[in-house]
């Protein structure tokens, strides 16, 4: 979907195109918005206008929690301040690392304590940026659910960790890739983000990551995270079976072409 000057209207239209979210936007269910931000200085995170549009799309929900956890670069509490202008009595930041009410689960063969918020009847929204990264974006965003500050030990089995987390919390109810900017990623010939002004919204997180990866020049059929998600039955990872509405796919690819150029070796 093209991101117009009125971001909220563009987002609302995108939600309509995927059939709306009446089952998610209800007075009976709170919403967890998993924002993804590794380090604020990198500016690779969902923009405030898109985050505001997400909040506005859940007009009926009694409470929205913007959630993040600590990492070795700092606390989740501090990183969540990026969206502080959106916070109110209804929209609140929450550091998962500070929750003492947890449930122990097994992730990639190891026990892990996760926040109680993740196991109650809440809607889970995962929002991240359009980027060149082999582990995707909205699914990789789940790596911010574990509360520990140092998570490097999980990188050796990262695909399993991410997909186990996906299954343990009941999946992602709404996946959003903010393509206000496209980020080329490590090893790219493009060193800075470029304006793309597109975004992807979908109920199938695997499909959203698949389309996002293809837009950035990657081949989903060669991405282990996507293929493992398919084998587990977690979503659709075949581009031929994914309907993209609201914007021409090839046109979107052309728009972000500068960020897809790779260095020749």
Feature annotation, model-predicted:
Residues 1-265:
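N-terminal and secondary-structure boundary signal
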């Amino acid at each position: 979907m093209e991101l117009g000057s009125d971001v909220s209207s563009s987002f609302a239209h995108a939600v309509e195109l995927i059939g709306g979210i009446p089952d998610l936007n209800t007075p009976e269910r709170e919403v967890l918005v998993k924002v993804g931000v590794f380090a604020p200085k990198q500016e690779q995170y969902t923009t405030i206008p898109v985050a505001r549009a997400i909040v506005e799309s859940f007009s009926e929900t009694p409470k929205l929690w913007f959630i993040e956890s600590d990492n070795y670069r700092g606390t989740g509490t501090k990183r969540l301040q990026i969206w502080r202008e959106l916070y109110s009595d209804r929209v609140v930041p929450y550091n998962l690392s500070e929750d003492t009410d947890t449930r122990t689960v097994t992730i990639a063969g190891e026990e892990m304590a996760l926040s109680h918020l993740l196991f109650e009847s809440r809607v889970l929204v995962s929002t991240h940026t359009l980027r060149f990264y082999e582990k995707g974006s909205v699914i990789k965003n789940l790596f911010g659910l574990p509360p520990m500050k140092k998570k490097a030990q999980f990188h050796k089995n990262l695909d399993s960790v991410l997909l186990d987390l996906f299954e343990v919390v009941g999946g992602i109810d709404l996946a959003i890739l903010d393509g206000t900017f496209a980020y080329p990623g490590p090893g790219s010939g493009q060193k800075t983000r470029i304006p793309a002004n597109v975004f992807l919204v979908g109920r199938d997180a695997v499909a959203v990551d698949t389309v996002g990866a293809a837009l950035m020049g990657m081949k989903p059929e060669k991405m282990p995270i996507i293929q493992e998600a398919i084998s587990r039955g977690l979503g659709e990872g075949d581009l031929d079976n994914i309907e993209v509405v609201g914007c021409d796919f090839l046109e979107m690819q052309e728009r972000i072409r500068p960020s897809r150029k790779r260095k020749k070796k």
